[in-house]
A protein has these predicted regions:
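Predominantly soluble domains enriched in secretory-pathway, periplasmic, or organellar proteins
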Residues: 23
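A residue-level marker of the well-folded mature domains of exported/periplasmic proteins
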Residues: 2-3, 7-18, 26-240
Length: 240
């Protein structure tokens, strides 16, 4: 990806494709965007990004390669994201040289990134399992000239426009806020609720939790009577 204009065009297409996949999965709504970027940047809706047929043809002629390093591949959401990326890369003539699943292990993801780097992809699309523990691996990938697009959260200490191109995300805070509002209205503004949440330092779920709690403040007669965190998705039902 030697040409800066072409890189921007390609990233625009990937950003649109990823957000479109999220929309199809029910994660993006045509409403006010409440979330902000990792440094407080205003979010931009996918509908503002559009490529011409000529630009798409230029991407196809580029002979680019890509790798996808997932944080976890064992649910429908991840499967939808992967399929959306694979379909879009195929349409653009971009070869996928690796798809990895860290199974929510930072150590595994670091190893995955190191393995992927040996394949020298032009593009890396990834969701960090742990924004701190994986940071050095992403920095090494950036230093090697790989263009990184993060999904949902970035790795800590990386600079936008220098170490990575963009963060593509659903409106996680907004989704949590909407969930709280729907629940509050359904209860008629009164009642007791229990909250189950993902108990880890993972920005997307933390933002949804924050949005839900903020929405609950609008319903002073609704009390969160108990909370239960979990770290193992397979054991969530048992903990409940």
């Amino acid at each position: 990806l030697g040409d800066s204009k072409m890189r921007k065009k390609l990233v625009g297409m990937l950003t649109t494709a990823t957000l479109l996949t999220m929309a199809l999965a029910g994660n993006v709504q045509a409403a006010e965007i409440r979330s902000v970027g990792p440094d407080g940047e205003a979010a931009v809706d996918a509908s503002t990004i559009e490529l011409t047929d000529e630009q798409i043809e230029q991407v196809k002629e580029g002979g680019y390669t890509a790798a996808i390093c997932l944080h976890y591949g064992g649910n429908d959401w991840s499967t939808s994201q992967q399929k959306g990326l694979e379909d879009t890369f195929k349409e653009l003539g971009i070869e996928i040289v690796a798809v990895t699943d860290a199974n929510f292990s930072a150590e595994t993801q670091v190893s995955n990134i190191e393995t992927v780097m040996a394949k020298k992809p032009d593009i890396l699309v990834s969701i960090p399992t742990d924004a701190t523990a994986t940071a050095d691996a992403y920095k090494q990938a950036a230093a090697a000239g790989i263009k990184i697009i993060f999904m949902d959260q970035r790795a800590n200490g990386l600079e936008a426009g220098k170490d990575y191109v963009s963060v593509v995300s659903a409106d996680n805070y907004g989704n949590g806020y909407a969930s709280g509002t729907v629940l509050g209205d359904a209860l008629g503004g009164k009642g007791k609720v229990a909250m189950v949440y993902y108990d880890a330092n993972f920005a997307p779920t933390n933002q949804r939790d924050e949005g839900f709690r903020d929405a609950m403040k609008n319903y002073p007669d609704i009390e969160i009577v108990t909370e239960q965190g979990f770290t193992d998705e397979s054991g969530c039902a048992e903990q409940g």
